[in-house]
Amino acid sequence: MQNAPMTALLPDALVMAAIVVAWLIDTFVGPNSRRTTYFIALLSTVVAGIWFAIDALTPGAGPQYFFSRMYVVDPFASVMKAVVSLGYAVSIVYSRKYLEDRGLYEGNFFLLGMFSLLGQLVMISGNNFLTLYLGLELMSLSLYAAIALRRENAPSTEAAMKYYVLGALASGFLLYGISMLYGATGSLELNEVLKAVASGRINDVVLLFGVIFIVAGVAFKMGAVPFHMWVPDVYQGAPTAMTLIVGGGPKVAAFAWGLRFLVMGLLPLAVDWQEMLVILAALSLIVGNITGIVQRNVKRMLAYSAISNMGFVLLGLLAGVVDGKTGAAASAYGSAMFYSIVYLITTLGSFGVVMLLARREFEAETLDDFKGLNQRSPVFAFVMMVMMFSLAGIPPAVGFYAKLAVLEATMNAGLTWLAVLAVITSLFGAFYYLRIVKLMYFDDPVDTTPIVGDACKRTLLALNGVAVLVLGIVPGPLMSICLNAISHTLPL
């Protein structure tokens, strides 16, 4: 459909309008606008997220194209946009007290976060290599600035510089790859590139080099090995509120962005990029799970956890095509989509507890800070235990089903050795997740002060934990949504 009704873009426009309104209020009202800016960001993203969710659940919705087919609204985009929008809303609720204690409760944080969210929306709905790239840069530039908000804090500025320099390098790779694909196919639109590549009348060498550079760019944004160097330093160096913004929605958007690039644009070259993803996935699983064992800083440990989890997402991406056939593609890509959503939900809960333990002039970042948490707050200790079980893949947490679905897709693709590697490395990873559980329940607390968070945050954290358990017991509805979105969107 070429001339789709513009009403399909209203939730995206709502986020843009909220940015403009919040920016004007923050500029002309000043410090007194902090509370207003927070509520504008929260309300707009919750409404947009619910709107996206309603669109995603509307039966019979097909792709709708806008702006000369550069932007697409389809079931896949609606689901992922709902996830990142609601994920951002939860992030700022968890971050509020943390920001107030550190003098960061200001419009800049919320504005940069919303600009990052807008970039994620563009990444998810991009139907053109240029649109996908612009969405990526809008997201990335906002995150660089957000990480460096504490200019007087050396670790924060160092983390921002590392992220910026390596991000610029990855953007260069990506642009070079896109330019080679454009030179070979004569188009930047995903559908046209797909047709041109499928025709087989294009220089294979140019295509292969283009794919290599694009895969490198995708791997960097997902934090996959060997393009992971920025992840541990950024997670540890940035204030925890910024770490959650970086490690939450952008990971989901990066997966959606990679799916658009590789599947919607370069599916005929699946044999080529699959081989590269196999290497990236294997390295990510090994490095993420084994290196995480020796970490004493919880944020750095969760960074290596993110790397290993992106390895699982890559498993789902590479398992979609078997011997050039796409019969099992919907199941594989649906499992990867399900995994990325589950990872976001679990990450929100994990960092929510980390920020809950932090207080003015104190960061709860070491393993010792979790000792005896059950004695200080049984509810929050239970929530953290559920999150660790999910990350480790222990039932009944939803992480178990997510890992099982990806492993099944990998086995069906004939990559048994890779599935076995994933299981073995996950056993290593389970050690550092269960170590936190042991510290919370079997060690004496260093600080016996009871933990009391605000009512909103307590309620949201409890719901976060319940969601992980309920989805683990009844994963079918969410998996069905993912499979439906994939089957009605991708060229399978």
UniProtKB/Swiss-Prot annotation:
EC identifiers of the protein: 7.1.1.-
GO biological process, one term: ATP synthesis coupled electron transport
Signal sequence residues: none
Top-level EC class as recorded in UniProt: translocase
Xref: Pfam families: Proton_antipo_M (PF00361)
GO MF annotations in UniProt: NADH dehydrogenase (ubiquinone) activity; NADH:ubiquinone reductase (non-electrogenic) activity; quinone binding
TM ranges: 5-25, 37-57, 72-92, 104-124, 129-149, 164-184, 205-225, 239-259, 276-295, 302-322, 337-357, 380-400, 414-434, 466-486
Catalytic activity: a quinone + NADH + 5 H(+)(in) = a quinol + NAD(+) + 4 H(+)(out)
Alphabetical UniProt keywords: Cell inner membrane, Cell membrane, Membrane, NAD, Quinone, Translocase, Transmembrane, Transmembrane helix, Transport, Ubiquinone
UniProt cross-references to InterPro entries, sorted A to Z: NADH-Q_OxRdtase_suN/2 (IPR010096), ND/Mrp_TM (IPR001750)
Membrane topology type: Multi-pass membrane protein
GO cellular component entries: plasma membrane
Subcellular location: Cell inner membrane
Major location category of this protein: membrane
Free-text function comment from the UniProt entry: NDH-1 shuttles electrons from NADH, via FMN and iron-sulfur (Fe-S) centers, to quinones in the respiratory chain. The immediate electron acceptor for the enzyme in this species is believed to be ubiquinone. Couples the redox reaction to proton translocation (for every two electrons transferred, four hydrogen ions are translocated across the cytoplasmic membrane), and thus conserves the redox energy in a proton gradient.
Subunit structure, interactors included: NDH-1 is composed of 14 different subunits. Subunits NuoA, H, J, K, L, M, N constitute the membrane sector of the complex.
Family of the protein in this entry: Belongs to the complex I subunit 2 family.
UniProt name for this protein: NADH-quinone oxidoreductase subunit N
Taxonomic classification: Bacteria, Pseudomonadati, Pseudomonadota, Betaproteobacteria, Burkholderiales
